[in-house]
A protein has these predicted regions:
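Membrane-embedded multi-pass helical conduit in multi-pass membrane proteins
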Residues: 222-285
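Conserved short acidic donor-positioning loop in nucleotide-sugar-dependent glycosyltransferases
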Residues: 8, 36-38, 64
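Acceptor/aglycone-binding surface of glycosyltransferases and processive sugar-polymer synthases
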Residues: 61-62, 66-76, 85-88, 94-171, ...
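Short hydrophobic beta-strand elements that form part
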Residues: 1-5, 59
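Short beta-strand/loop segment that forms part of the nucleotide-sugar
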Residues: 28-38, 58-60
Length: 285
């Protein structure tokens, strides 16, 4: 099963599904689109595919962003649908359908709980690549976890059940996967180019993404940041008041972590299906 969140990008999603249809062979693939309260409609003409088994849409009432849409999709699929593995992927073309075969091959060979798509090449410009590298380094330093993947993963049914045992997946998908599965299989992935329009990932969104991942490991972060604050506080006391600047920055960082941690809430995750407005079956073989 493939899970695709979408907000006002129907043209890209249906192009992706057409490409998925052309890249799968004997696999039985059902696709679930999570419509994150899109304000734009899509062409409702009956879609036809040669290999895909079915396509359905879960329409949400309120927009919550891709991470909450994916969490809602996982929760719905776990409680209502039959599947062996589920693959969340972005609907804009940046997660390449050509790499699905690599997921399928690993599933058939070793039946791992989790497979992640490790980025070995990105398609963005130099500035974004540089900032993304800073994000990975910062996350690694502050959490002790080196996260090289995004939403594009392959999860067994047991892995989905484990992810849904706490609220961390409501906060950060990649952070939650890393938290629950320290060891996982990987495939190599090249970041594709968007089918239509510019990337929606701004610098601010990247910073927020980094902070959310960090918040998943808030207990570890709290200890590390408090130690750093104390060290710079002592340096400020015995050496120079300028050392108060990084100490204050540490307190500000902890404040943001505490605020973001409010989304790490199992109650919100357990109640997320109340945000489903309707279900639509748009294709079935």
């Amino acid at each position: 099963m493939i899970l695709i969140p979408v907000f006002n990008d129907w043209k890209s999603v249906f192009k992706l599904i057409e490409n998925i249809d052309s890249h799968i062979n004997n696999e039985i693939i059902d696709i679930v689109i999570i419509n994150d309260a899109s304000t734009e409609s899509f062409d409702n003409n009956q879609k036809q595919f040669s290999k895909i088994n079915s396509v359905k849409i879960i329409n949400l009432i309120k927009n919550g962003g891709h991470r909450k849409a994916i969490a809602t999709g996982l929760k719905y699929c776990q409680e209502n649908l039959d599947y062996d593995y589920i693959i969340p992927m972005d609907g804009d073309g940046e997660d390449r359908p050509e790499e699905l075969i690599d997921f399928f091959n690993q599933v058939h060979e070793t039946q791992p709980e989790v497979i992640t798509a490790t980025r070995v090449k990105r398609s963005e410009g130099f500035v974004f690549k540089f900032l993304y590298s800073i994000h990975k380094i910062f996350t690694h330093l502050i959490t002790g976890k080196l996260i090289k993947f995004g939403n594009y993963t392959c999860l067994s049914k047991s892995a989905v059940s484990k992810l849904l045992t706490d609220g961390s997946v409501w906060l950060s998908y990649s952070g939650a996967v890393t938290k629950h599965f320290p060891q996982f299989s990987t495939i190599q992935s090249i970041r594709g180019k968007r089918y239509f329009g510019p990337s929606k990932m701004s610098i601010f969104a990247l910073i927020l993404h980094s902070l959310r991942i960090s918040t998943v490991f808030k207990e570890n972060i709290f200890i590390r940041v408090v130690i750093i604050i104390l060290i710079f506080g002592l340096l400020a006391y015995y050496s120079s008041a300028y050392f108060l600047i990084p100490s204050l920055a540490g307190w500000v960082f902890l404040f943001f972590i505490i605020c973001l941690a409010l989304d790490d809430d199992i109650k919100k995750l357990n109640n997320c299906l109340n945000n489903i407005k309707s279900l639509s079956d748009i294709y079935s073989r």
